[in-house]
Design a protein with these regions (language model features):
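Amphipathic alpha-helical packing segments from all-alpha helical-bundle domains
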Residues: 83, 128-157, 161-168
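Alpha-helical structural segments
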Residues: 23-34, 38, 52, 69-91, ...
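Intrinsic, short, N-terminal disordered tails of RNA polymerase sigma-factor systems
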Residues: 1-19, 109, 131-133, 137, ...
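Helical hydrophobic small-molecule/effector-binding pocket
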Residues: 88, 98-122, 131-141
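Amphipathic C-terminal alpha-helical segment
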Residues: 109-113, 149, 168-187, 199-210
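Short hydrophobic/aromatic patch on the recognition helix
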Residues: 55-64
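Residue-level preference for short helical/loop micro-motifs built around acidic side chains
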Residues: 42-43, 68-69, 98, 119, ...
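Basic, helix-initiating cap at the start of DNA-binding domains
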Residues: 1-39, 43-52, 69
Length: 212
């Protein structure tokens, strides 16, 4: 498997695969997601994916020659789905404040309902937190830079260093909430999450970008 930071970078920058044009590939990755959620990503094998997909062995191996290819493609696809959900949330708000709240609700909802993320959070939350604790912090940096770009897009006059610091705080908060869900706000209640974002995250972003 390629390093996670590299996969996330591909998810952000590379041209997406048209899944409508290759339904077989989609079926394979859907099976891989179900299998990884059931047994864990580390224990998943290509043979497991073949069995769960219901496709022929050679059909699967023609598209993914080895296990790492399946894992890499799955991670990139799910990251793209996450970014698309967040982008859709950002597009829902009529104001930067509404957009921030909608994006936070969308991100937390994705994490809450995603089968593989839920398995990791339930069985090994330390793996999620390790992305923030890793020495090179590449994954955290990518998340921070993505958030910073969204903040800067709605607040072009904001101080760049302040925006980066604010984005770093939000990225760390999100990882913590995914790994160790809070009691308040209730991560299962979109209304609570939206109120939390408006009451706390929006002022933090405004103050942190020098516009509060």
């Amino acid at each position: 498997m390629a390093e996670l930071a590299g996969l996330l970078a591909r998810a952000i920058t590379a041209e997406p695969v048209d899944e409508v044009e290759d339904p077989t590939r989609t079926r394979i990755l859907d099976a891989a997601l179900d299998e990884a959620a059931a047994v864990g990503l580390a224990r998943m094998t290509v043979e497991d994916v073949v069995r769960r997909s219901g496709l022929g062995r050679m059909t699967v191996y023609r598209r993914f020659a080895k296990r790492d290819d399946v894992v890499d493609a799955l991670v990139v696809r799910e990251c793209r789905r996450f970014l698309a959900v967040v982008a859709e949330g950002l597009g829902e708000g009529d104001t930067p404040e509404d957009a921030t709240a909608a994006a936070f609700v969308a991100a937390m909802g994705f994490a809450r309902t995603h089968p593989l993320l839920r398995r990791v959070a339930d069985t090994d939350p330390g793996a999620v937190l390790a992305t923030a604790a890793a020495r090179d912090r590449q994954v955290l940096t990518l998340g921070r830079d993505f958030i910073a770009a969204q903040i800067a897009g709605s607040r072009p006059e904001a101080d760049a260093r302040a925006v980066r610091r604010t984005a770093d705080l939000i990225a760390r908060l999100f990882l913590t909430y995914v790994a160790v869900p809070p009691d308040d706000p209730d991560p299962r209640d979109d209304a609570h999450l939206r109120a939390f974002a408006r009451d706390l995250l929006v002022p933090v972003i405004a103050a942190g970008s020098g516009l509060g």
